[in-house]
Amino acid sequence: MKTHHANLALALMLGLSSSATAVAADAPQAVATKAAAPNVKPVAADAHGVIPDGAPGMCARSPACRATAIPADAFVRTADLGRLTDADRDALAALGVKLDIDLRTADEEAQSPDLLARDDRFDYQRISLMGTEKMDLQKMMTSFPDSLGEAYVQWLGHSQPQFKQVFQRIAAQQDGAVLFHCTAGKDRTGIIAGLLLDLAGVPKAEIVHNYAISAHYLEGQPKDSDERADHGAGQAEPGDRPQDGGHGRYRAGQHGAVLAALHSQYGGAEGYLKSIGVSEQEIQQLKVRLGQAG
């Protein structure tokens, strides 16, 4: 995996219009075409790479952050992959994606099947970060506190077995890029990305920007999780609740509060992973993938 230095640290899929096409890494128009979400200041490097025409999230390879060298082809983050074209799948294969981790519930997957799951070029695994039964999700949502930051901290505690499984599966992947996605491409993927970035020693401000910029790119996207939550389907994520403002209104300070709580309660991502049963060897393997060891 090649190592590059720049702004965001991970190869990401961030939400853009499904009709978008490829964007050059240094093209300022890529960030000037959409109004930024509150508290977000996009830079040209935030839009970079190949954009699947059929996906509600773009396939964007974010260059590595300024302070920490992370392989630019280590991870890909995206939204729902139920509308990928053949060309989209070819583009992901060309990016080196080998593993697709679907963070959605069984109901979400049934409503919009992941099209990489039936492509032999990709290994597919679904690990729901929101529980296994609809009633569990509804109970979890009603118990969330008013603060989105507090909700994320509770989420880290509530879904420890699922987080453990996700990071163990990533650690076990020896080659290629690891793609992880949910429905909206923001909350579940965002918290996984945040933990990876923190494990790599990325500065807090850049982790917050990494999360908040997704709201910028999600502007104008169908609020699938919001709509399903309104109809009682039980698939809402914390940031999709009406009191949290939905997509595009995320307050960056809230994610900063999550990071502060992560360090206060667990000593950071590494401490959290150890507390949920991820082994020292697996953490070392994660660091190798992140370009921080080996």
From Swiss-Prot:
Pfam families: Y_phosphatase3. Keywords: Hydrolase, Protein phosphatase, Signal. Disulfide bonds: none annotated. Residues 1-24 form the signal peptide. Its EC number is 3.1.3.48. GO terms for molecular function: protein tyrosine phosphatase activity. The active site is at 182 (phosphocysteine intermediate). It catalyses: O-phospho-L-tyrosyl-[protein] + H2O = L-tyrosyl-[protein] + phosphate. Residues 221-231, 238-247 have a biased composition (Basic and acidic residues). Residues 221-252 are annotated as: Disordered. Monomer. Belongs to the protein-tyrosine phosphatase family. This is Tyrosine-protein phosphatase. The gene is iphP.
